[in-house]
């Protein structure tokens, strides 16, 4: 399969290749919106770099998905090194999980070029990545759509750009493009937002970390407004509208398993995906969802990253959050482009009121 880069993809690839070929020793970041084709950028960088390149992925599912895309672009001098994926092949280009690599560090001494997908997940204070970076000869570039980390301070939790935290792993952004730019060029799907929440989040306490809402307090607010009734009711309306065409597929983000179970008990052809769903069952459900055999998927704490389904046209947000990154990742599931698609964001959680349209979010690097 041959491919042609869009202008912003070429600019991102050029920036990475320039850094890898330079004598710079800093760790850099490339920021590309969800749906911008990050996997293609990674593939192009890999094809242009001389010598070994290791590409770290945050999960088995994303690793397998992006590795398959790499090979679909005609790049075959590549391998997978991941215990969870059941493969330990080292090649010039190696897609890997950090845990598997750190158990056999000596195998990877010759890898001096490093890409890290979803790099906002890297802990700058401790962990396996920090140990891996201690080799000063390595050049590291991270890629993300959400370059933020939640940091604690005297005033409570604060969202900071990952190049401005203390300590920090990444020092500078070498390339970024805005969501609004890609929308204007037709590279992302247009979105329509429906703000219909009944929740009063001022009644909900923040958890002990300051990062998000307290679960017990949030559950009490859910029960006060009977959010379960609203989730079921709006899902039925989306499946059987009084006018217009029913939505192609509906992905619902819930906070607790009980909302998902309520949906599954009242909505025919609704499946549940959670962290405890067996891998084979999860794969079967998502295949059925993409094939159109399953119309509704209620997911609990998963499918916020790496779920690639461009035809998806509707998400229902029933998971309140204080995390801008999480909000963006959830909306990002429906912003991927598909011909003739208008993505719908049906918000029962108050997230839209807190953060607004993702199209209006801007990355300011200065």
Task: Describe each region flagged by the PLM.
Residues 1-31:
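Conserved pre-motif I regulatory segment
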Residues 22-45, 249, 253, 273, ...:
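Walker A/P-loop
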Residues 34, 40-72, 255-258:
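Conserved Walker A/P-loop ATP-binding site and its immediately adjacent core
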Residues 64, 78-90, 251, 259-263, ...:
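Conserved helicase ATPase core of P-loop NTP-dependent helicases/translocases
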Residues 71-106:
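Inter-Walker segment of RecA-like/P-loop motor cores
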Residues 99-105, 275-363:
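Conserved RecA-like P-loop NTPase helicase motor core
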Residues 121-193:
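Post-DEXD/H (motif II) to motif III coupling segment of the RecA-like Helicase ATP-binding lobe
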Residues 171-251:
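Conserved interdomain linker/interface between the two RecA-like ATPase lobes of SF2 helicase motors
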């Amino acid at each position: 399969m041959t491919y042609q880069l869009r202008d912003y993809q070429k600019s991102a690839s050029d920036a990475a290749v320039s850094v890898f070929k330079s004598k710079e020793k800093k760790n850099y970041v490339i920021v590309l919106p969800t749906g911008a084709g990050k996997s293609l950028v990674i593939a192009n960088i890999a094809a242009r770099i001389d010598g070994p390149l290791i590409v770290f992925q945050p999960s088995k599912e994303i690793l397998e998905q992006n590795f398959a895309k790499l090979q679909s672009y005609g790049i075959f001098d590549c391998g997978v090194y991941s215990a969870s994926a059941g493969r330990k092949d080292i090649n010039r280009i190696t897609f890997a999980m950090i845990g598997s690599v750190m158990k056999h560090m000596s195998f990877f001494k010759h890898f001096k070029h490093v890409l890290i997908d979803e790099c906002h997940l890297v802990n700058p204070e401790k962990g396996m990545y920090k140990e891996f970076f201690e080799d000063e000869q390595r050049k590291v570039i991270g890629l993300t759509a959400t370059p933020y980390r939640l940091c604690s301070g005297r005033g409570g939790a604060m969202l900071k750009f990952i190049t401005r935290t203390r300590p920090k792993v990444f020092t500078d952004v070498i390339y970024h493009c805005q969501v609004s730019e890609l929308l204007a060029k037709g590279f992302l799907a247009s979105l329509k937002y429906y703000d219909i929440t009944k929740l009063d989040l001022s009644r909900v306490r923040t958890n002990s970390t300051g990062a998000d809402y307290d679960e017990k307090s949030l559950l009490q607010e859910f029960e006060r407004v009977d959010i379960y009734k609203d989730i079921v009711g709006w899902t039925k309306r989306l499946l059987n509208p009084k006018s217009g065409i029913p939505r192609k597929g509906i992905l619902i983000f819930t906070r607790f398993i009980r909302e998902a179970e309520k949906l599954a008990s009242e909505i025919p052809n609704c499946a549940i995906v959670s962290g405890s769903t067996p891998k084979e069952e999860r794969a079967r459900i998502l295949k059925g969802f993409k094939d159109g055999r399953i119309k509704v998927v209620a997911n609990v704490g998963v499918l916020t990253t790496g779920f690639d389904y461009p035809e998806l046209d509707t998400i229902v947000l029933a998971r309140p959050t204080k995390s801008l990154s999480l909000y963006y990742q959830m909306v990002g599931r429906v912003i991927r482009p598909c011909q003739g698609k208008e993505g719908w964001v049906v918000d029962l959680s108050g997230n839209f009121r807190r953060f607004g349209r993702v199209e209006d979010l801007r990355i300011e690097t200065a």
